[in-house]
Structures are given as C-alpha cells and as structure tokens.
Amino acid sequence: AHMVPVEFWEWAIKAVKEKYPDVKFIAELYDVSIYRDYIYRGGFDYLYDKVNLYDRLRGIMCSNVSAAQITQCWQTVDGIGNHMLNFLENHDEQRIASREFAGNAQLAIPALVVSATLSTGPMMVYAGQELGEKAEDAEGFSGLDGRTTIFDYWSVPSLRRWMNGGKCNNELLSDEEVRLRDTYKKVLNAAKNEPAISRGQFFDVMYVNYNNPTLDPHRQYAYLRKDGDEVIVIVANFGAEANCQIAIPQHAFDILHLEKGTYVATEIISGKRQKKTLSPDAPFQTAVAANSAAMWKIKLTRQNASPKKKSSIKGGRDK
C-alpha cells in the first residue's frame, strides 16, 4: 500500500465497501508520518505497525533497545491506536524462536502482552507463533534464514504436529510448546474478552517510575487499562525475575476515576488471587517472573475492598 498513492486507495476502498461493507483493508506502511493520511483519507481499517511498535519490541527482546521506548510508540500513534494491527511475527519477519532472532520463544511473552494489550486495536498471531516455531528448515527458495517459506511446497513443522492428522491436539507437542500455547491463549482471550483491554482507557505510569530502584525502565514496562469498575495493572518484564513496587500517581486516579483501597486481585495469566493495595500513597507490589508479565485484574467495588479497621478511640470529641 505504501508505494501506491493514497488518492487511489481513497477511491478504491470506498468503491469496494459500497458493495462489500464488511471487507477490511489492512495497509503495510513504513512511514509513521503518513499513517493518519492512509486511515482518514485512504480509508484503511488497520495499518501494520511495523516500524513503530514491532521494531521497538524486537529490539527490546534482543536486549539492544530500552523498554522505556514503548512510551514513545503509543505516543506516536496516540488517537489512532485502535487502527494499529500489532504483531510479532508475519511472513516477512524472522521467527522469534529462530537463531536469527531471539532463539527462545519464551522471550516473546512480555512483548506479546504489550502488543496485545497496549491499545484497543487488533493483534495478529502468525502460523505456529503460539507454538514457538523455530524455522530450522532450509526450504528451497527461502533457504535457512529464520523464516518459514511462503514460496515453496512446504509445511510448518510445529503446525504439522499440532494438526496431528486432523486431530488438532497436544499429542505430538512438547511440554514447552503446550505451556507456550496456553500462555498465548490466556493473553489473547484477555485482550478479546476483558473490556478494560478491548475498549478501555490506557494510562502509562512509567513517568513516575524512571528512578524507581525496584523497577528497571530498560527491562520493565508498566501501565494501566481501565473500563467501568475494573482496572488491570500490567507489568511486562523483559529481564530477570523482579519484585516491583510500582508508583501509581494521583493523576491516574483522577483521570481513570480510581478509588484507592486494598482489593482482592486476580492475575490473569497464572490465575493467582492476592490482596493488592491500589493507592497513590503506597506502591503497587508484584513479583514478575523472568521474561514474563503480570496482569492484575481488580474489581473496584466495595464488596471486593478489604474492610477498614475500626478506630481504637471511643467516645472522643473535639474540645
């Protein structure tokens, strides 16, 4: 789409949608300065956010880009985030688990969480990504390049084992592949089914945590998603295991209409339930495993809040 003038798309997309209104148009662009033109004038429903979010996340996974740059990513597409198609793999890019990229599919988990939950836009998962496809074959035209071919008569090994002769089950998968797929399933279902993610507000809390000794802004990234009476505190960890004490500013409470208190929270990926304090006066505490993420869902209701302790002062009055 990038090499075709936007005037053509303005005409073509409108003409197609007059007859087929449900058709979605996705553009592959490599210049963020023309994103808005191709959305508002050209009429594209979604844009591959390759040169913005994908490139940054790849760099973070490979430890040569700071996680703090994620803030710049959402700021670049502020107001059009719902039109961004986020992804970590596609037919052009190298597989995350390949030797040419990260060499380990687990390293994708924090990037997966960010890519799937940073905005209300869609997330694309490519064939076998959720199984940690390693692209170890040298397939004719493509050769051994960290990609799975789309040019040759070939099949993707991990997907072939998942298909299992039409059974579509875990019988031929390794334990590692099963665990990875389960994590993808939980994150993607949360992105689809949790209103705070699929349609909610976003608040980046990194600006008050850059000097936080419990959080490394180069390897961890924290933010909030909020809808109605539910808030999700998300921490993506691209580094070693961390015990983070995250500052949440009063501004977040004002903008998102949060009510401070101690609540029973559910961690979406693990299913664990713990009491968590949500307050501008005390840090939000969470442990995050290495190369993983924590997604704490809190229902902001009085029934969920811990009861306040009764005062020990009885019968007092001002004089």
Stretches with model-predicted labels:
Residues 1-122, 127, 131, 137-138, ...:
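Alpha-amylase-like alpha-glycosidases and glucanotransferases acting on alpha-linked glucans and related
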Residues 78-81, 90, 95-262, 290, ...:
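Loop/helix patches that line or flank the sugar-binding groove of alpha-linked glycan CAZymes
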Residues 1, 27-29, 127-129, 235-238, ...:
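Active-site proximal loops enriched in glycine and acidic residues that flank catalytic Cys/His/Asp
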Residues 262-281:
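Solvent-exposed beta-strand/loop surfaces of large extracellular or lumenal domains
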Residues 49, 66, 174, 249-251, ...:
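Helix N-terminus capping/helix-initiation residues
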Residues 32-34, 242, 272-274:
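Flexible, glycine-rich phosphate/dinucleotide-binding loops
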Residues 276-315:
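C-terminal beta-strand-rich structural cap/linker in extracellular carbohydrate-active enzymes
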Residues 317-319:
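Non-Sec secretion/translocation targeting segments of pathogen effectors
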